[in-house]
Curated annotation (Swiss-Prot):
Belongs to the serpin family. Ov-serpin subfamily. One of its GO terms (molecular function) is serine-type endopeptidase inhibitor activity. It comes from Xenopus laevis (African clawed frog). One of its GO terms (cellular component) is extracellular space. This is Serpin B5. Disulfide bonds: none annotated. It is found in: Secreted, Extracellular space. Keywords: Glycoprotein, Secreted.
Length: 383
């Protein structure tokens, strides 16, 4: 399980860094676990160089049984989904002209029970597109509509890899709505924009990355199965968001070190955090290619012979959507009277760009990963 956690973290950090390279100032959010689960299913059905490329990008070199690992991981995460407004949709749609091997189908039933779906795309591509969109809308309680654009499916579409994730949770300690005030958010050294800034005083886990002058704060959600981790540089020291050094230095080993509970202390913290809602949409095809998955998207080079005898089987589309909302809602109020009497409170004021991670605490799996650089349009799109 530890090997799989590290592997999934590796892919999460790789994707995060690619998105940061694409734009230094965009807000974004994505769900690494949705992407890694779908890729792991496709890896299960691949052979030859296609399998080698997928294995490398998934960081599976030291993972002995990825299928069993995902089975355990999915079971752990599914147990807490009902507690939160958390939706995780991971689908690999395969055109039914591709006859999947029975052995392959049987091998996916436990580790990927809902992820594989056959659908008639070839003979009715537009109907199939609408059917997929309708299914995604229903399974995410209406959070996502028109995931696949008109004309995106045709008779040549073979495999669609699709992920959608949304989250809105209740904190263990709610932020007092009456204390939410408009404050300046520093986009960079020179520019500010107004945000609705929430306020909380409570005992929380907080750490510090000395070499990067960055604070790490854990804000737990109700029942403490999930937490948001916020990485906040103490000052904006570059010519952009202040996150450049943190983004460049991040590796999956360093991420694991920075967010390790043993590196954090329980302290009295005065928190200022902006309310925000982010929605991002990505075509992952070019990004996954840049990470090293090439053959799987090339019908002349792809080898999915572990899945099917059908030739020219390749991934036609890889679409991902994610949405997260952060507000004051919580289950209990901290003992504010006591906390305000106590001295030596640390201040964590997120009035400048920060990185955030939604983490499943038992497995330390990254459910969502994102960057907030200030108030802007409701959604972002990346190719």
């Amino acid at each position: 399980m530890d090997a799989l956690r590290l592997a999934n973290t590796g892919l999460a950090v790789d994707i995060f860094k690619k998105l940061c390279e694409k734009s230094a100032t965009d807000n974004f959010v994505f769900s690494p676990i949705c992407i890694s689960t779908s890729l792991a299913l496709l890896h299960r059905g691949s052979q030859g160089n296609t399998a080698s490329e997928l294995q490398k990008v998934l960081h599976f070199e030291k993972v002995k049984d990825s299928d069993f690992g995902f089975q355990l991981l999915s079971s752990d995460i599914s147990k807490v989904i009902s507690i939160y407004s958390l939706k995780l949709l991971k689908r690999v749609y395969v055109d039914n002209s591709i006859e999947c091997k029975k052995d392959f189908i049987n091998s996916t039933k436990k580790p990927y029970p809902l992820e594989l779906e056959t659908i008639d795309i070839k003979s009715r591509p537009e109907e199939a597109r609408c059917q997929i969109n309708s299914s995604v809308k229903e399974l995410t309680d209406g959070n996502f509509e028109a995931v696949l654009n008109e004309g995106s499916c045709d008779e040549k579409t073979k495999i669609i890899m699709l992920g959608a994730a949304s989250f809105k949770g209740n904190w263990v300690y709610k932020f007092n709505e009456s204390e939410t005030k408009e404050m300046d958010f520093h986009i960079n050294k020179k520019e500010t924009k107004p945000v609705q800034m929430m306020h909380l005083e409570a005992r929380l886990s907080i750490g510090y990355i000395n070499e990067l002058k960055t604070m790490v704060l854990e804000l737990p959600f109700t029942s403490k199965h999930l937490s948001i981790l916020i990485l906040l540089p103490k000052d904006i020291e570059d010519d952009s968001t202040g996150l450049k050094k943190l983004e460049q230095d991040m590796t999956f080993e360093k991420y694991a070190q920075w967010t390790n509970p043993s590196m954090m202390a329980n302290s009295k913290v005065k928190v200022y955090l902006p309310k925000f809602k982010l929605e991002s949409s990505f075509d992952l095809k070019d990004m996954l290619k840049s990470l090293g998955i090439n053959d799987a998207f090339n019908e002349e080079a792809s080898d999915f012979s572990g899945m099917t005898e059908s030739k020219d089987t390749s991934i036609s589309q890889a679409i991902h959507k994610a949405c997260i909302e952060v507000n004051e809602d919580g289950t209990e109020a901290p003992d504010v009277t006591m906390e305000r009497r106590l001295m030596n409170k640390e201040e964590f004021c997120a009035d400048r760009p920060f990185i955030f991670i939604l983490r499943h605490n038992k497995t330390r799996t990254i459910i969502m990963f994102g960057r907030y650089c200030g108030p802007c349009e409701a959604s972002s799109t990346a190719d």
